[in-house]
Amino acid sequence: MKDILKLFKKNKKVEEFDSIKISLASPEVIRSWSFGEVKKPETINYRTLNPERDGLFCARIFGPIKDYECLCGKYKRLKHRGVICEKCGVEVTQSKVRRDRMGHIELAAPIAHIWFLKSLPSRIGLLLDMPLRDIERVLYFESYVITDPGITNLEKYQVLSEDQYIQALEENEDEFEAKMGAEAIQNLLKNMDLKKTCKILKKEVLKVNSETKRKKVTKRIKLIESLLTSKNKPEWMILTVLPILPPDLRPLVPLDGGRFATSDLNDLYRRVINRNNRLKRLLELFAPEIIVRNEKRMLQEAIDALLDNGRRGRSITGSNKRPLKSLADMIKGKQGRFRQNLLGKRVDYSGRSVITVGPYLHLNQCGIPKKMALELFKPFIYGKLEQRNLATTIKSAKKMVEKEEPIVWDILDEVIHKHPILLNRAPTLHRLGIQAFEPILIEGKAIQLHPLVCAAYNADFDGDQMAIHIPLTKTAQKEACSLMMSTKNILSPANGEPIIVPSQDVVLGIYYMTRKKINGKGENMLLSSPKEAEYMYSLGAVDLHSIVKIRILEYKKDEKKNLTEKKKIIKTTIGRAILWIHVPMGLPFKIFNKTLRKSHISEILNTCYRLLGLKKTVRLADQMMYIGFSYAAKSGVSVGINDIIIPKEKEKIIFQAEKEVLEIDKQFQTGLVTSSERYNKVIDIWAIANENIADAMMKNLSYEIIFQKNKKKITQKSFNNIFIMADSGARGSAAQIRQLAGMRGLMAKPDGSIIETPITANFREGLNVLQYFISTHGARKGLADTALKTANSGYLTRRLVDVAQDLVITQTNCKTKKGILMNSLIEGGDIKETLKERVLGRITVENIYHLNSKNIIIPKNTLLNEKWCNILEKNFIDSIIVRSVVHCETSFGVCAYCYGRDLARGKIVKKGEAVGVIAAQSIGEPGTQLTMRTFHIGGAASKVASESSIQIRKNGIIHLNQAKSVINSNGKIVIISRNVELKMLDKTGKTQESYKIPYGSILTKGEGQKVKAGEIIAKWDPHTIPVITEVNGYIKFIDMVDGKSITKQNDELTGLSSIVVLDISERNILGKDLKPALKIIGKNEEDIFIPGTDMPAQYFLPGKSIILLEDGMKISSGDILARVPQESVGTKDITGGLPRVADLFEARKPKELAILAEINGIVSFGKETKGKRRLILTPIDGNNIYEEMIPKWRQLNVFEGERVEKGDIISDGPESPHDILRLRGVQAVTNYIVNEVQEVYRLQGVKINDKHIEVIIRQMLRKATIINPGDSNFLQGEQIEYSKITSENKKLKKNKKETATFSRDLLGITKASLATESFISAASFQETTRVLTEAAVAGKKDKLRGLKENVIVGRLIPAGTGYKYHKKRLKNRIKNSVNKKNNMSSISVEEAAANLSELLNSTENINNRI
C-alpha cells in the first residue's frame, strides 16, 4: 500500500509558495507534527550505542539510524521499505527522516511560553492588562489571581498574596475562584471575549485624554485585532504540549575514550522530561500542594531555559560553567541560524592566494597559477577528457590529472579559454569588490592582478590575498561576462566617475612625459607628425620635455557619429606628442596638451567614455598604463636626502613665534589674559608659524631659476623628485613634505586636545627624545582609532544595507508632479558644488524656460546628461526642480524616472536594479576613510567663529532674502529680521556668493545696488545682540526701578554711566514681577505703533541688557536701544566623521537642540517657574495660543513682541531633523540630511552622489502616524506605511468618504529596518526574539518581496537577473490559477495521493493503538 503511495509521491512537485506565514501553534497542531511522545530522558545506551526506546533519540519515534534497516536488524535493505518492524516498532526507511521527524512531550501542567511573557512589551500582560510583575508572581506560584469573582466585592484579574487569599476565603468562603500558576493565566486567556473587549476599548480610546493611556489602549486594540484576524487563540501562548526537535538537529556524537559530545538542547530537554515525569508521579500520588507547586515551578523554569535560557533569572549552566545554548540562542546573533547559515553560506569551487602585480595584462585578464587552475577546473577537464575519448571513466581521467600528463595542460588551456572567473578581495565593501576576469595561465603560486583594478578592490601588493570563484553553469558564465567583467565596471556606482584611474607610478610616468622644460635639446623644432617626434626622440635628437611645434591630426565626431579630420600645427612637447600616438580618434588634443596630473587623467578617461564609449576607454586606459610604467622607469625618479630642502627662513619664523609666546606668557602673569585665552593664542601662533614655514618650503621646492639662451633669468617648475611625486598626485602631499622639510608642528594628546609645545624639528633634521615621545601620542591614537573605525564603519554599512535592501527599480515612471529644488551650493564666496554637478543624471519635473523669454530650453521628463547640463550653464539658470526618490509615488520600490541615471553605466537606470543596496554600499564603503574624531574648537578655529563683517570677493549686485530693515540716523540700512541671507548676483542674475547676516547688522549698500570686489558691505558686533527700534519717538522707561529691576553702573575709565537690567535670579522679591521695557512714545505721550501692525512699540529687555540711553531721550528708527551681551562660549565639541554620519542616519536628537517656533505668531513671555521661562506664541489669526517652557540658561534669539514664522529659530543650537520635518516638511528635512552628510564626506574629499543619501532618506520616511482616521480602518496614533495610507486615501476619495489625516515620521535606520513589513528580514537584522514574537501573535505573512527574504528561502533575488525570473514566476502562477479553475472537475494525481494517504493514516493509527 505504502509503495503505491511512494509512486504517487514521485510525481509530486514541490509546491510553489509565494509567502510564509508565522503564527502560534495550537496543542493539536503540535501533536500533528509529532511522530510519538518522548517519555524517558534517556538518550542512548552507552554500551550498544543504540537509542533507548521512548527516549530522546528513540528510533521508533524519529526513524531508523541506518538507511533502510530497523533497530533489531530483522528488516534490512530497500525491498522492505515502508515496513514497520513488529519487534522494535521502527519504520524501515531512509535515516535522513531523523532530520525532520519531530516528537512531543505531554506536559503534566500548563506552562507559559517565556517569549510571550517576557519579551517586551509582554503580550500576555498587554492582553490581560495586568502588570508583568503580577503575572510573574502568579506564574511562579507566589500569588493568586481571581479568575471568577462570583458575587463578592473582589475584582477579576485582582492579584492576592497568600495572606490576602486566606483572608478572602474566611470572608467569602467558596463564593469566588482564585488560582495560581500557568493554569490560572490560561483560564483567564481562554475566558476572554476578544470581540467584546475590542468594542469596549474602541469606545474608550475616544474618551481618553492622557497621551500615555491612549498609546496603551491603542496597543491593546492592535494586539486584540491581530489575534482576531490571524485566528490565533490567546490561550495558545500557554503550552500544554511541548514539541521536540528532530534528533539529527541536536546530535550526540561519541568521542574517543567513551565520552560524548552533545548539543546543549539534549541537556535542556532531559531536564524538562525529568521534571515533567516527576510532576506526573506526584500528581498521581496526590502529593501535598506545596510539593506539587514547587515541582510545577521547576518545570516552568526548565521550559523557560529550553526556549530562552537567561531571559528570566540566572542562566542554567552546564558542567563547564558555561550557559547552555537554548533554542532562542540558536537563531539570534551573528552565529545564529539567520546570519551564519541562511545569509552567509560557504562557496564551493574556490581558491585563494597572495596577489602580485601583472603590468602586462589587459584590463579583462588576470593571471592564475597553473596548479591552481588545474585544481579548480577539474570537473571541466574530466568532462573534456571523456568527451575526446582520452579517458574512459572519471576514475581514469582523475589519474591522468593527478599524474599531470602533457595532454592535460592542453585541455586546461582549452577549458579556461573564454571561461570567466571571479576574483574577490575581503572586505567586500561595495559591488566592485568582486569582479570577473579571463584567466591567463602563469607559472608561480601568486595570482596576478591588473594594476588599474586595485583602486576598486582597495588592494595593494604587500601581502594581500584574494579568492577565486568559478562560475560553473552557462548562465552564470554569461552573467559574469556581461555584468561583472572588469571592463564593464569602469565607472564608480557611488559618483559616476571613472574608478579605473591610474595611480602611483603610472601617474608619475605620464606626468613626467607631459612636463615641459625650457632650454631642452631641439627646442622650437618643426615636426611633421607625432610619429616623427617619437623617431627623433629615439635617435636622441630631442629631449622628452622640449617645446616643439608639431602638425597634429585631430578627429571630431559629428551628430551622425562620423569622424571628420582636422590638421593643426600646435606648440607642444615631445612627450605629449608620443602620448597622442596611442590616443583613440575622436578626442580633442587640448585635453592632452598640458602637464597631466592624476585628476586630469581621470577627466580624460571620463571624456573618452562619454564621447567614444566603453571599448575605446578600456583600450586607452590600458595604453596609458603601459606608457606610464615605461616612462616612470625611464624617468629614474627616486628620493635622495638632498631632495629634502629646508627653507632658510625657518629659523627666523620660529624665533619670531617664540618671542610672541613669551609676550603672551607675560600678559598672562600680569593677569591681562585668562588661562584659556593664553592657551588658544599660543596654539594660534604656532599654527600660523607652521603655515608660514610650509609656504616658504613649497616655494623653495616647486620652482627653480634657470637662464634662457639670451642669458635672461626665469623661473620654471622644478624637477625635484619629491615635488614631482606630490605635484603629480602619485604619492605624498604638501602636508607630508612639510613634516620632512618644514616642521612637524602641533601634536594632539589622545583625548584630542592639542599639546601647546610644538615639534619644531622635521624628519630631515631628526627628532630629539622629547619630540619623539610627544609624537608617539598621536601615532598610537591613530592605530587605536583605525581598529575602532573599521568595526563602526562595518556596522553602519550593515544597518544601511538592511534598511534599503528591498528598494528595487520596479516601474519606469510613477508620473509624480513633485520634485526637489536643486541649486548651487555656495558658502560665503566659495562655490562648493555647481548646479551642473548636482543635477547631472537627474530628470526634470517641469519645462525649463529661458530666463527672459518663454522659450522652452529643456522639456520636462528629460534626463539631464552632460549636453543638457552645459545648456543650463550657458543660459545662466540658477536653480531647477528635479525628480527625486524621496517623492517617488511607486508603492513598492522606486521608478526609474525618479532615480535618474545609473551612475555606473551612464544611462537611465534599468528595471530590477537594486538601487537600495548600491546606495548603502556607496555611503558605507568610504566609511573607513572618515575620522572618528570629535573636534574641539579652540585656537585657530575659534577665530573663524567670531566674524564681524563681510567683504565681497567679486563685483556684483546685492540681493537680500526675507529681509526687514530700517534706515538709521546716519542713512545706513539696519537689518531687523533674523535668518537673512545676502546674495551677490552677477549681471545675469546668477548667485556667485552667499552670506548669512545676523540681526542688527549695518549695511553700507542696499538691495539691488552694485558693489565692487573687496568692498566691506556689512558690519556687526559679534559679542552683543542689539535691540533696535523701528520707529521715531521718545523713550519712556517702564518697570525700571533702580535696585529692583535695574542697576546703574559708572565706568571709571570713560566716565559714562549705563543701566544694566538685573536677571530675575538676581532681583529681590519686589522686583520679581517687574518687566523692564522701553516704550517709544510720541511728543504728547501717545502710543506709536510698529509699522504694519496694531502693536504699540514696546521693547521688553532680557536680563543683563545694557542701556546707554536716558529716559525721555529722542531717538530715530534704526537706533540701538540696548545691547544684550552674548555669553562667550568656551571650546565646543563638534562631532565629526563617522559618528556624525551615524547620528544623522539614526535621526538622533542632538543635545541642546535648537528650539523652533511651532506656529506663526507673536512672541510673549508668561509667568516664569523655577529655572524655566514660559514662551507664549499668539497666532495673528486668533487660533489657539502655543506655550512652551524653555530653560533659563538658553539664549533666546527673539524679543517680546517680535513676530515669528513657523519653523523660525527661537534659540540657537543644532537642529533636530524631527523638528525640521514637522515644521518645514519633507523637502527641508531631505535637504538638511543630504547637506549634513555631504559636509562630512566633503571634508575627506570623498564624492558621493546625493541620490544615494536620498534613497536612505526615503526609507527613513516610509512610516506615518495617523492623526485622524476618518472613515478608514486605521487607529488614531497608529504607525503605518506611508504608501498604505496614500493608497487607502485614494480609495476613500473615490468613494467620497472622509480620508485619514497623518503626519510623516522620520525613523532612524535601525528602527526603520525593524519596522519593515517583512518579519524575516527584520528578524535576521536585530532583536530576533522580539520580532518573531510580535509576528507570531499577529499571524504575520511575509510576501517575500525584499532581497533578504528571498536569499533566506534560497531563491534568486527579485533584482538584477533575478527580476525577470520573479516576473516569469508571477505570470506562470496567474496562468496556473486560471487553468486550475477550469480543471476543477478532473481529479489530480495529488488529490488521489492525498485521499489514499488519509486512508493509510487511519489504518496506521489503528496499528499504533494495538
UniProtKB/Swiss-Prot annotation:
According to its UniProt record, the EC number is 2.7.7.6
Question: Which catalysed reactions does the entry list for this protein?
Answer: RNA(n) + a ribonucleoside 5'-triphosphate = RNA(n+1) + diphosphate
Q: What PANTHER family has UniProt attached to this entry?
A: DNA-DIRECTED RNA POLYMERASE, DNA-DIRECTED RNA POLYMERASE SUBUNIT BETA
Q: Which residues bind Zn(2+) 2?
A: 814, 888, 895, 898
InterPro entries, alphabetized: DNA-dir_RpoC_beta_prime, DNA-dir_RpoC_beta_prime_bact, RNA_pol_asu, RNA_pol_N, RNA_pol_Rpb1_1, RNA_pol_Rpb1_3, RNA_pol_Rpb1_3_sf, RNA_pol_Rpb1_4
Which residues belong to the signal peptide in this entry?
none
Spell out the protein name for this chain. DNA-directed RNA polymerase subunit beta'
> Known Gene3D superfamilies for this protein?
1.10.132.30, 1.10.150.390, 1.10.1790.20, 1.10.40.90, 2.40.40.20, 2.40.50.100, RNA polymerase II, clamp domain (4.10.860.120), RNA polymerase Rpb1, domain 3 (1.10.274.100)
Q: Name one GO cellular component term.
A: DNA-directed RNA polymerase complex
Q: What does the UniProt cofactor note say?
A: Binds 1 Mg(2+) ion per subunit.
Organism expressing this protein natively? Buchnera aphidicola subsp. Cinara cedri (strain Cc)
Report residues binding Mg(2+): 460, 462, 464
Q: Which enzyme type, at the first EC level?
A: transferase
For whether the record's keyword set contains GTP-binding, the answer is no
Function text: DNA-dependent RNA polymerase catalyzes the transcription of DNA into RNA using the four ribonucleoside triphosphates as substrates.
Q: How does it assemble?
A: The RNAP catalytic core consists of 2 alpha, 1 beta, 1 beta' and 1 omega subunit. When a sigma factor is associated with the core the holoenzyme is formed, which can initiate transcription.
- Where is Zn(2+) 1 annotated to bind? 70, 72, 85, 88
Q: Which cofactor does it need?
A: Mg(2+); Zn(2+)
Q: Which Pfam families match?
A: RNA_pol_Rpb1_1 (PF04997), RNA_pol_Rpb1_2 (PF00623), RNA_pol_Rpb1_3 (PF04983), RNA_pol_Rpb1_4 (PF05000), RNA_pol_Rpb1_5 (PF04998)
In the record, biological process GO terms are: DNA-templated transcription
Q: Which family does it belong to?
A: Belongs to the RNA polymerase beta' chain family.
CDD domains, per this entry? Answer: RNAP_beta'_C, RNAP_beta'_N
Concerning SUPFAM superfamilies, the annotation shows: beta and beta-prime subunits of DNA dependent RNA-polymerase (SSF64484)
Q: Which UniProt keywords apply?
A: DNA-directed RNA polymerase, Magnesium, Metal-binding, Nucleotidyltransferase, Transcription, Transferase, Zinc
Which GO MF terms are attached to this record?
DNA binding; DNA-directed RNA polymerase activity; magnesium ion binding; zinc ion binding
